[in-house]
Amino acid sequence: MSTHAPVITVDGPSGAGKGTLCMLLAEKLGWHLLDSGAIYRVLALAAIHHGVDLESEDVLVPLAAHLDVQFKAEGDLVKVILEGEDVSGELRKEETGMTASKVAALPRVREALLRRQRAFSNAPGLVADGRDMGTVVFPNAIVKIFLDASAEERANRRMNQLQQKGLDVNFGSLLSEIQERDDRDRNRSVAPLRPAEDALVLDSTDMSIEQVTAQAFAYIEQALEQKS
């Protein structure tokens, strides 16, 4: 991991707006982008492409350590490039998700992916999106942000997204799913979801993405000025 490239971490629960904020910050700063939530799916896809044994840590660890992946912000989307190929669509397939769950359960694979994520820290800088970026992966990040929103607001945003795709969804079911995931993430024994002690906590419940980005960027500019 580069010791000179500055890192900005954005952690928080699902649906708080981390992905959009990170993409906008990376574009504004001209920095690299890491979507840590996609990294296990990327590894799963690489394993499927290479036809390797999904239960063999001896095979998966070197694959994880040398994972050739890039995250590129384009418009309002993040493109995921695996070994030179845009795999953004494939990442969303059910098979990829199921395989990701299997490989994520292997301790040595998790350790290899932790090191691989840290290797994203290259000049001019990195914006890292996740749940434990500021607490575990990049504890020395120059700026740490914890982006939150009420479960009800996050369920409402998700419902609007799905309805725009023409899907019929139930608000109560979405809210229950989000609350259950929050409970799992906040109470897990390894890297529970929580703000780093030195993180700026932003509650986006009653804020637009423009307001969130403006507040985050003002904080980042101040931190970068103090560091220079």
UniProtKB/Swiss-Prot annotation:
It comes from the Bacteria. Its main location: cytoplasm. It is found in: Cytoplasm. GO terms for molecular function: ATP binding; CMP kinase activity; dCMP kinase activity. Keywords: ATP-binding, Cytoplasm, Kinase, Nucleotide-binding, Transferase. GO terms for biological process: nucleobase-containing small molecule interconversion; pyrimidine nucleotide metabolic process. It catalyses: CMP + ATP = CDP + ADP; dCMP + ATP = dCDP + ADP. The keyword Lipid biosynthesis does not apply. GO terms for cellular component: cytosol. It is an enzyme of class 2 (transferase). It holds the Pfam family Cytidylate_kin. ATP binds at G12, P13, S14, G15, A16, G17, K18, G19, T20. This is Cytidylate kinase. It comes from Photobacterium profundum (strain SS9).
